[in-house]
């Protein structure tokens, strides 16, 4: 209170003022590196048989981002297939049994019993093109919309005219129990860039592709069987943390 009125400031002698400044500078020098580390975004590079791409993990979905980073650092995704690919929708990976799967075998059913609490953060993170999200079981068996611990997908999607997007917005509002789930700014991006708006508010988006989006396009175009598995394997050769940036 005194500082706001200016009384204490004017009563300070030069030595006392210098002491206060030194303490203040030391405090900032200690706090700044810590806050800097907390504000960095982790990036992960995927090297695949179809090319390379890099994703950025979001800071404000800490449970998913940290868990995913731990899996990457442990080498979990190395050698796994993109076992489910749907053109104009998304590509999916993370089934541990896909590493040595024979051709034509149905994949995607195996998963860890562990699940992650949802971190759905609309309207900030949604299913625009290039979004990285975790798969999950349906609402019938998973009403809490908890995420798979390992299986992720990357959105490609398609563009929407306002008329085509209108019924999707209505269905999403019904699914989430909220009005205006897809905001006007989100709708504009779906109309011009594309994505999968029907998933909004129901799955956790925790990252985005920042490099190599053309590789996602290439993968989502491959020929698949009746189970959406690519006829020719698309494999993750390696996934690694390539750095952190502010």
Describe the residue ranges of each PLM region.
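Charged/polar low-complexity intrinsically disordered segments
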Residues: 2-7
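Intrinsic-disorder-associated, low-complexity terminal segments enriched in Asp/Asn/His/Tyr and depleted
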Residues: 9-11
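Intrinsic-disorder-associated interaction segments
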Residues: 14-15, 179
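Positively charged n-region of N-terminal signal peptides that target proteins for export
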Residues: 16-21
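Bacterial N-terminal signal peptides
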Residues: 22-31
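Cyclophilin-like peptidyl-prolyl cis-trans isomerases
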Residues: 34-246
């Amino acid at each position: 209170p005194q500082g706001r009125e200016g009384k204490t400031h004017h009563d300070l002698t030069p030595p006392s003022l210098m002491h206060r400044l030194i303490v203040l500078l030391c405090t900032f020098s200690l706090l700044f590196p810590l806050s800097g580390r907390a504000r960095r975004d982790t990036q992960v590079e995927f090297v695949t048989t179809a090319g390379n791409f890099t994703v950025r993990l979001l800071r404000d979905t800490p449970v998913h981002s940290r868990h995913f980073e731990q899996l990457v650092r442990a080498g979990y995704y190395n050698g796994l297939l993109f076992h489910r690919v749907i053109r104009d929708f998304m590509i999916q990976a993370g089934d541990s049994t896909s590493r040595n799967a024979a051709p034509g075998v149905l994949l995607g059913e195996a998963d860890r019993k562990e699940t992650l609490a949802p971190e759905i953060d609309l309207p900030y993170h949604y299913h625009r093109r290039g979004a990285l999200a975790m798969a999950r079981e349906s609402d019938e068996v998973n009403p809490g919309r908890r995420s798979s611990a390992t299986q992720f997908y990357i959105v490609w999607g398609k563009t929407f005219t306002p008329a085509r997007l209108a019924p999707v917005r209505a269905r999403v509002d019904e699914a989430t129990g909220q009005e205006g789930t897809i905001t006007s700014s989100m709708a504009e991006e779906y109309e011009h860039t594309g994505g999968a708006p029907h998933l909004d508010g129901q799955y956790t988006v925790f990252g985005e592709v920042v490099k190599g989006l053309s590789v996602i396009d290439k993968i989502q175009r491959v020929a698949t069987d009746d189970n959406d598995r690519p006829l020719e394997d698309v494999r993750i050769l390696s996934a690694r943390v390539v750095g952190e940036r502010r």
